[in-house]
Amino acid sequence: MSGLASKAKSRVKSSKGKNSTNIHADELNEDVGVVVRVMTAVVDVKFASGKIPKILNALESKEIYNGKKLVLEVSQHISDSIVRCIALDGTDGLSRNDKFIDTGAPISVPVGRGTLGRVFDVLGNTIDECGPLEESSYFIKQIYSEIPKLTDQKIATEILVTGIKVIDLLAPYLKGGKVGLFGGAGVGKTVLIMELIHNIAKAHKGVSVFAGVGERTREGNDLYHEMIESGVINLENKDQSQAVLVYGQMNEPPGARLRVALSALTMAEYFRDAENQDVLFFVDNIFRFTQSGSEISALLGRIPSAVGYQPTLAAEMGAMQERITSTNSGSITSVQAIYVPADDLTDPAPATSFAHLDSTTVLSRQISELGIYPAVDPLDSTSQALSADVVGKEHYDVAKEVQRILQTYKSLQDIIAILGMDELSEEDKLIVARARKIQRFLSQPFHVAEVFTGAPGKFVSLEDTVLSFKGLVEGKYDHLPEAAFYMVGSIDDVIKKAELLQKEGKV
């Protein structure tokens, strides 16, 4: 339960001794307003003159709509008596003169140990049909909070091992850092984020919080069951669960999709600040957060900015992203899937996210068309952690040599397409052969895709990854066929696959 109802009731009871249930549209008091205009997801509410609610306050309906009370969030003051609000649920059935109560505070959600193993909506209501939360197991906290002071923040220098070769080698993640998974439609963002949840959250000793922002309901359901199967959520004993899920899916109004990331982040901040934990914060998808803000902005009457986005895009993104940080109390490591419209990384939505991230993992349609998954572009993906001071000299040197070989291969592709391989020098032929093996070795079978591929998932340690690629760039495996490097884990798997291919006479 969100706690909005109880706050509203207590305020209404204490307001000048009046019984607010008998108030008509022309007898407004400071707590009760009436609807004067409805524009789908935006609603205008009139209060007594000079007694309007503060910006960001939550208003709760007195009537029931679609089986529950409707909550609005104050966004603008239109006059000294009218506020323009964002609806956080569907407005079907809402009409003029319907009454709303000012709760006197912003949206609040439950935080604490009692939230573990549960699924919530944007308002903090449980939606997993496992009953209400135990009263003693949670606290209520507003979804808006101050950004931690610079003196309280901590710099991340420790590598977070994901078990995914291409990420650990070329764009490593920092523990306590922010990571963006960029990609167009259908290149594997959600599968990659689910594999990261499987690999990291399962081995992670702290708490994981997942925010489903405007994505498919089916994927949210799949993730919930995946977490149950992997033991991250324990239905029998919720206290042993390690994850909280907060969903505002595609079918929900833009107001819910705009605020659900903040609701989830509030829960993550509690575990960081009050319980001194290292928290994993997954968001799928940040673009939907931006998109919902654009929908709301148009309805609020703001003049659109570049490519039709809201003029407040940078401010909204910054207000959320700057709260995702590590402090002296604990850390929040954030992994965010970011949809790239029309595969254009210069689009304002993904471009605004870049400035806030420590690591960027770019998924490429060209690589996915080659059948290489995860379709991570090893040349476009970046990480602040890829320096000799953080990852060590050996790792850094191997990663840079891998990138050099791949870059050389990329520059030779036009010549190969026009003149063929025979026109290349012997040195270039060797580079091309190694690059093709590296390209295939960067593929990897995922645990979460086992049901589709039939191939068991592989987790590769950082040490194995560095040693395997070191041998590859030094030419130790030049004698092995290309096919042996495709969809395997460590170099030992490559050698076994090469022997198997030889026995079957396929090489």
Curated annotation (Swiss-Prot):
Residues 1-22 are annotated as: Disordered. Keywords: ATP synthesis, ATP-binding, Cell inner membrane, Cell membrane, CF(1), Hydrogen ion transport, Ion transport, Membrane, Nucleotide-binding, Translocase, Transport. Signal peptide: none annotated. It comes from the Bacteria. It catalyses: ATP + H2O + 4 H(+)(in) = ADP + phosphate + 5 H(+)(out). Pfam families: ATP-synt_ab, ATP-synt_ab_N, ATP-synt_VA_C. It is found in: Cell inner membrane. InterPro entries: AAA+_ATPase (IPR003593), ATP-synt_VA_C (IPR055190), ATP_synth_F1_bsu (IPR005722), ATPase_a/bsu_AS (IPR020003), ATPase_alpha/beta_chains (IPR050053), ATPase_F1/V1/A1_a/bsu_N (IPR004100), ATPase_F1/V1/A1_a/bsu_N_sf (IPR036121), ATPase_F1/V1/A1_a/bsu_nucl-bd (IPR000194). GO terms for cellular component: plasma membrane; proton-transporting ATP synthase complex. It is a peripheral membrane protein. Produces ATP from ADP in the presence of a proton gradient across the membrane. The catalytic sites are hosted primarily by the beta subunits. HAMAP family: ATP_synth_beta_bact. This is ATP synthase subunit beta. The gene is atpD.
